[in-house]
């Protein structure tokens, strides 16, 4: 467990990147407050996010979450002009495991007509190989009637990775290779600092791997950066970005979320308004397969 002391809140939040330091995950906080007792702060209130105003048809808004959700919350996101949701399907806790809460969240998001992408927060210190962790995610979703077409791999919080960049690259290669065996599109969630620290600025990654990068100045509305890609700079093998996380620790529809903007690609089946493919009864009873992923264009 990384211990931080004698630092300001802003530095602490920036050092943690978009994750809490102890669990190496995208920030997805308790409904109202963030406990940060390890660094001497009691609670951080999630501020209400500004209303989405999108005047650029080439961009769309999303949120990323790793907490349980309800149908009403997903419907609220849809009516609040969010087009997609990134849902964690693999948790790093323990040795790493399929995140069972993702099943209900995916069904709820599908019912609401939201586009759905799945990300995994791998556990690089586990005895499980990278491909085994991807298998757990893939089989967990498939066994619950959910077909996955793409996966995003979280590569952040250097303190939670091996010290050897070569070891980390091999671990990631194991995940990526397995994902491609399944025919999945692969994306990486990281930024220039994290990528450099964890992989040694790995520059030979396949060019078909997508990038979701984060850039915030801190938590809440005052820490937001513009919901554009104007601040992107190429690094590693990434010459362009498909998704940007521009806000963290904000409240939307009674959920504490991070907010994202992405380049609009070919709409996925999961984001179609033509929901008569699946009735709510079908979704609840698992009679039909839900297809997720592919919302983000190359």
From Swiss-Prot:
UniProt keyword list: Antimicrobial, Cytoplasmic vesicle, Immunity, Innate immunity, Signal
Signal peptide region: 1-16
Chief location of this protein within or outside the cell: cytoplasm
Superkingdom of this protein's organism: Eukaryota
Biological-process GO terms, alphabetical: cell wall macromolecule catabolic process; defense response to Gram-negative bacterium; defense response to Gram-positive bacterium; innate immune response; peptidoglycan catabolic process; signal transduction
Domain Ch-type lysozyme: start-end pairs: 59-277
InterPro entries, alphabetized: GH25_Enzymes (IPR051595), Glyco_hydro_25 (IPR002053), Glycoside_hydrolase_SF (IPR017853)
Keyword Iron on entry: no
GO MF entry, a single one: lysozyme activity
Tissue: Expressed in intestine, IL2 and IL6 neurons and some neurons in the head ganglia.
Gene Ontology CC: one annotated term: apical part of cell
Subcellular location per the Swiss-Prot or TrEMBL entry: Cytoplasmic vesicle lumen
PROSITE patterns for this protein: GLYCOSYL_HYDROL_F25_2
Deletion phenotype: RNAi-mediated knockdown causes a reduction in survival in response to bacterium S.aureus infection.
Induction note: Induced by Gram-negative bacteria S.marcescens and B.thuringiensis infection.
Keyword Signal: yes
Family membership: Belongs to the glycosyl hydrolase 25 family.
PANTHER family for this protein: LYSOZYME PROTEIN, LYSOZYME-LIKE PROTEIN 1
Function: Involved in resistance to Gram-negative bacterium S.marcescens and to bacterium Gram-positive S.aureus infection.
Name recorded for this polypeptide: Lysozyme-like protein 1
Species annotation: Caenorhabditis elegans
Gene name, Swiss-Prot/TrEMBL: lys-1
